[in-house]
Amino acid sequence: MPVIFNICLDDAFIHSNNPFFGKLPEAYAIFDPIVDVMPIIPVLSFLLAFVWQAAVSFR
Protein backbone atom coordinates (compact mmCIF):
# COMPACT_ATOMS: atom_id res chain seq x y z
CA MET A 1 0.00 0.00 0.00
CA PRO A 2 2.76 2.54 0.74
CA VAL A 3 4.16 1.95 -2.75
CA ILE A 4 0.87 2.95 -4.39
CA PHE A 5 0.65 6.02 -2.17
CA ASN A 6 4.21 6.95 -3.10
CA ILE A 7 3.46 6.58 -6.82
CA CYS A 8 0.44 8.86 -6.45
CA LEU A 9 2.51 11.47 -4.64
CA ASP A 10 5.26 11.29 -7.24
CA ASP A 11 2.70 11.67 -10.02
CA ALA A 12 1.16 14.72 -8.33
CA PHE A 13 4.62 16.22 -7.85
CA ILE A 14 5.47 15.77 -11.54
CA HIS A 15 2.24 17.41 -12.67
CA SER A 16 2.62 20.32 -10.26
CA ASN A 17 6.00 21.25 -11.74
CA ASN A 18 5.11 20.55 -15.37
CA PRO A 19 4.48 23.72 -17.44
CA PHE A 20 1.96 21.87 -19.64
CA PHE A 21 -0.44 21.43 -16.72
CA GLY A 22 -1.75 24.80 -15.62
CA LYS A 23 -3.95 25.84 -12.76
CA LEU A 24 -7.24 27.61 -13.24
CA PRO A 25 -7.46 31.21 -12.07
CA GLU A 26 -9.10 31.73 -8.68
CA ALA A 27 -12.31 33.02 -10.25
CA TYR A 28 -12.79 29.67 -12.02
CA ALA A 29 -11.82 27.43 -9.10
CA ILE A 30 -15.41 26.20 -8.77
CA PHE A 31 -15.09 24.59 -12.23
CA ASP A 32 -12.03 22.56 -11.25
CA PRO A 33 -13.92 19.23 -10.82
CA ILE A 34 -15.58 19.71 -14.21
CA VAL A 35 -12.25 20.43 -15.88
CA ASP A 36 -10.83 17.24 -14.36
CA VAL A 37 -13.60 15.17 -15.99
CA MET A 38 -13.62 16.90 -19.39
CA PRO A 39 -10.80 14.84 -21.00
CA ILE A 40 -12.82 11.66 -20.37
CA ILE A 41 -15.85 12.87 -22.39
CA PRO A 42 -14.51 11.83 -25.85
CA VAL A 43 -13.68 8.37 -24.51
CA LEU A 44 -17.21 8.01 -23.14
CA SER A 45 -18.76 9.03 -26.46
CA PHE A 46 -16.47 6.54 -28.25
CA LEU A 47 -17.67 3.77 -25.93
CA LEU A 48 -21.26 4.91 -26.38
CA ALA A 49 -20.87 4.42 -30.14
CA PHE A 50 -19.91 0.78 -29.58
CA VAL A 51 -22.85 0.23 -27.23
CA TRP A 52 -25.19 1.83 -29.75
CA GLN A 53 -23.90 -0.36 -32.57
CA ALA A 54 -24.32 -3.45 -30.43
CA ALA A 55 -27.89 -2.45 -29.61
CA VAL A 56 -28.75 -1.78 -33.27
CA SER A 57 -27.30 -5.06 -34.50
CA PHE A 58 -29.36 -7.10 -32.05
CA ARG A 59 -32.68 -5.88 -33.48
From Swiss-Prot:
GO terms for biological process: photosynthesis. Keywords: Chloroplast, Membrane, Photosynthesis, Photosystem II, Plastid, Reaction center, Thylakoid, Transmembrane, Transmembrane helix. It is found in: Plastid, Chloroplast thylakoid membrane. The chain crosses the membrane at residues 30-50. One of its GO terms (cellular component) is photosystem II reaction center. It holds the Pfam family PsbK. InterPro entries: PSII_PsbK, PSII_PsbK_sf. It is a single-pass membrane protein. Residues 1-22 form a propeptide. Its main location: plastid. Belongs to the PsbK family. PANTHER family: PHOTOSYSTEM II REACTION CENTER PROTEIN K, PTHR35325. One of the components of the core complex of photosystem II (PSII). PSII is a light-driven water:plastoquinone oxidoreductase that uses light energy to abstract electrons from H(2)O, generating O(2) and a proton gradient subsequently used for ATP formation. It consists of a core antenna complex that captures photons, and an electron transfer chain that converts photonic excitation into a charge separation. PSII is composed of 1 copy each of membrane proteins PsbA, PsbB, PsbC, PsbD, PsbE, PsbF, PsbH, PsbI, PsbJ, PsbK, PsbL, PsbM, PsbT, PsbX, PsbY, PsbZ, Psb30/Ycf12, at least 3 peripheral proteins of the oxygen-evolving complex and a large number of cofactors. It forms dimeric complexes. This is Photosystem II reaction center protein K. It comes from Pinus koraiensis. The lineage of its organism: Eukaryota, Viridiplantae, Streptophyta, Embryophyta, Tracheophyta.
